[in-house]
Amino acid sequence: MLTFALVAAAPWIVIPLIALWRARGDPSLDNESPEDTNEAPKVSVVIPARNEGANIAACVQSILMSRYPALEVIVVDDHSVDDTLAIARVMAGFDDRVTALEAPPLPDGWFGKQWACARGADHASGELLCFTDADTRHGHDLMSRSVHRLRSRRLDFVSVLGCQVMLTFWERLIQPQVFAMLSMRFGGAREVNESSNVIDKLANGQYMLLTRAAYDEVGGHASVRDQVAEDLALAQRLFEHGKRTELVEGRNYLSTRMYTSFGTLVRGWMKNIYAGGVRAAPFGWIGRALLPLALLAGPVASLVPIVVLILAAFGLVTKAWLAWSIITTVATFIWWVQVYVRAPVVGPARALRFAAIYPLGSLILAYIIVRAVIRGRRVEWRGREYVAG
């Protein structure tokens, strides 16, 4: 009985261990020196912004406080209905490094973010381009360290993984589960960088730094105009064109609060998880066809042990399955403890509480995935509807 339980439970034990091993030794901006200010190339920071009135001032201010000496900030308002553009214009009036633009009408076949980024790039004068989101906050040395990494390693593209700020119950419960699912697919930054397979390339659209020459050569954002995960698509396109791309940890220098409520969190991941995941599906058309099952595998694997354990409490399964459910539930709980401890949920005690209710998070994640699969390539975001390419 115990032998059966241990053998059957092996995937719940081995797969998390493999995931932890894959995430080891990630490159970090902590190991980079700031760029020499005497040789610093100009960086044009482009911020696409739609209804970001609550964020845009703090984002721009954090960039302007950078120790990097040669930069300009271009805020491109994507037809906001709040005061985003007005705030950006006020900031431009106080600092000549800031430019506030209003994007032209959105053409057919374009996503709003890519259109705004492309228009910002048109106005950029820097040798380097940096695309960042309005909900990010930049540390004083983020620009200097990322530029130094790009130049010292002769890279064409660097994307930084920042700290994901989570303040509400739902953020702390669900966000770590999504990121754990992504780590199961991609591993850590080191593995992404070392892979020679284009579908393994990944970027974080919250901070992407690249040379102007590489951006223009691959066609800029026009080349990924209809992609949900435009960051991943751009990194893959650069790699396909022989450019050197890198993903690097920078949680001490960049922070982002992606979603602020349960509703925005569900809608945001429903937009990205399936339509964006198609580009990263391995094994060609077979992988794309099986993507819904692959996405659901994680949350289902987390839920099955606890379901069997509940059935065992009512005497509905054999002793062998009871033993299996105990082993796998404990293994799954330990996995989620380390996931939540590594996430910024404010201390080990709180991480233990969230790990204890991991089935709720897994159930919600499964719900998000099912809804995303049903919608397919149809995407709704910020009051617009798109069809992903």
Where do the model's predicted regions map?
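Catalytic donor/gating beta->alpha subdomain of glycosyltransferases that bind UDP-sugars
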Residues: 150-183, 213-216, 221-287, 386
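N-terminal membrane-anchoring/stem segments of glycan-assembly enzymes
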Residues: 1-37, 175-176, 188
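Long helical/loop segments within the catalytic core of UDP-sugar-dependent glycosyltransferases
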Residues: 11-19, 99-122, 145-218, 222, ...
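Short, acidic, metal-binding catalytic loop of nucleotide-sugar glycosyltransferases
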Residues: 61-70
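Membrane-embedded multi-pass helical conduit in multi-pass membrane proteins
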Residues: 291-376
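Acidic donor-binding/catalytic loop of UDP-sugar-dependent glycosyltransferases
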Residues: 83, 87, 132-149
